[in-house]
């Protein structure tokens, strides 16, 4: 395992689940690019018996279908050594194949199964959640050496469908971890570990720009100044993060364009707007769908809701978190 900056609590929790001696179903969530996949891969690199990542819905000329996701899952099974089974036609079949694979591979040691970007796999009318429930409730929770780790950047999906699930997965999670961006001290440690020399003033400046997201910080070139790095990442021709706003929102939110409009509007006013004001400026109807978008943006750590000093609760405002 390479050096991991921070994350001491999260690593300790993961190791505690690993050594529990019982079936574990752990959900990890947090902002995209915050380092969830990196953390799991580093901690369980030598113990992972199966690893799968859902197909991204972004950067495609057509919407990713159920068939695409099932084929990708099937290929992951083959890649990890499964033989003699045809491609599944449903998630029920796919998870049954995973059961058979784990049974035939079982030597009594801990079996770590990591399914990354779980929300992407839940395409419309796919029956994915029902199949996941059947896999865990009917088989997985009886396997004392199984540790199922699921991960997702679509925080609202993770909260609604797993952590706060009111259906068949209610109370089934044995652990949950929310991964946060680096603190200012962790940012300093990160830059030092990469031999990036910056004054503390510039580290604070970088923190205000990048928000403590390690994926972005990792692009810094040690031979460039802070201003040169920011220019190269965001403003130069073919900038690595030039289209990050669009990519990020399209990969997380169902109504990406509307969510981006809300962010653009709030970016013009530090104090934010009330729900009604925001709906009017965005030219949206302040109905349940609008409320759901606001909740999704809050749960994904893009917005906060607050009451200005001296105001009543009816004057709640929404503003950008960073």
Role assignments for model-derived ranges:
Residues 1-321:
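Phosphate-binding site recognition
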């Amino acid at each position: 395992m390479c050096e991991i900056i921070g994350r001491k609590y999260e690593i300790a929790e993961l190791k505690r689940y690993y050594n529990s001696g019982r079936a574990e179903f752990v959900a990890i969530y947090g902002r995209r690019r915050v380092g969830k996949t990196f953390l799991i891969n580093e901690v369980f690199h030598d113990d992972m018996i199966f690893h799968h990542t859902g197909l991204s819905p972004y950067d495609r000329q057509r919407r990713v279908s159920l068939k695409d996701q099932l084929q990708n899952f099937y290929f992951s099974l083959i890649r990890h050594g499964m033989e003699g089974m045809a491609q599944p036609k449903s998630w029920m079949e796919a998870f049954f194949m995973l059961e058979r694979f784990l049974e035939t591979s079982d030597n009594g040691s801990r079996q770590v199964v990591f399914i990354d970007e779980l929300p992407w796999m839940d395409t419309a009318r796919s029956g994915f959640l029902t199949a996941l429930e059947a896999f865990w409730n009917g088989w997985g929770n009886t396997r004392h050496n199984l540790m199922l780790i699921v991960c997702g950047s679509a925080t609202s999906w993770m909260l609604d469908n797993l952590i706060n699930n009111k259906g068949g997965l209610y109370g089934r999670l044995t652990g949950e971890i929310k991964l946060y961006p680096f603190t200012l001290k962790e940012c300093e440690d990160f830059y030092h570990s990469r031999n990036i020399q910056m004054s503390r003033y510039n580290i604070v400046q970088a923190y205000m720009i990048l928000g403590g997201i390690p994926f972005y910080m990792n692009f810094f070139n040690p031979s460039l100044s802070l201003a040169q790095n920011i220019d190269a990442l965001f403003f130069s021709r073919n900038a690595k993060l030039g289209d990050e706003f669009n990519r990020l929102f399209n990969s997380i939110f169902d109504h990406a364009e509307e969510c981006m409009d809300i962010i653009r509007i709030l970016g013009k006013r530090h104090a934010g707007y009330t729900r009604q004001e925001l709906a009017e400026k965005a030219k949206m109807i302040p109905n349940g769908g609008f409320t759901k978008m606001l909740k999704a943006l809050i749960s994904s750590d893009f917005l906060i809701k607050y009451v200005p000093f001296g105001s009543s609760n009816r004057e709640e405002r929404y503003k950008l978190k960073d």
